[in-house]
Amino acid sequence: MSINTEEEFIGMQKVSDVVAVVLRKMKSYTKIGMTTKELDDYGGELLTSFGAKSAPKHTYEFPGFTCISLNHEIAHGIPSDKKVLKEGDLINIDVSAELNGFWSDNGTSFIVGRDIHGHKRLVDSSRNILIDRISSIRPGMKISDFGKSIERQAKSNGLKVIKNLAGHGVGRSLHEDPEYILNCEDKSNNSRFKLNSVVAIEMFISTKSSYATELNDGWTLVGNNGGYVAQHEHTILITKTKPIILTSANEI
């Protein structure tokens, strides 16, 4: 969406604060021995307490309030009472919601307990690339050039990107134009970032895989070549200078 009034800005900031706080609290709530279903139920309770609706459940009938992906899962992981969190697990929580007609989206990957499997470099790289690349966005920048810069930075860290997952426009629905803000160059995409537009910027930084494939459950995405992926995501407002990070309350 494009924000043209103070009321629209306030609406977007409110829903962004909600998803950001829910994400931050879910991260703090995460404990060894907990199931991902318990964690998701907690997230659902928080969303309800704010008067917000889970975006994936409301829009796509996703079987969970939030997407919780574990270890080799990249995205859209289904919360389950059979998935018990263990020391060193790589977990990703993605929280998106609707409040008063406005939608926002954010996510983070982190390590459960101690980093016994050496995931810290991947997680830190994903987070740092997100913040660094967001700060570079200006109106008129080609989205393809932005994606190219993400992949370049990932490669400089000895890592890859997932090339068929993307950030997207957001605001009056969960997914809006621009539909594909990829983590790589797409020469066929001539679209540019627009002043006052709201977009969700997502990193999908990978150790081995370059593409996501869907499991038989119809939701869960994994890498085509194994390995691990870290995802970090903010919803931002593009301004004449540095973008405003609407979901900054998640503290990722």
Stretches found by the model and what they are:
Residues 1-252:
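Active-site neighborhoods and metal-handling regions in enzymes and metal-associated proteins
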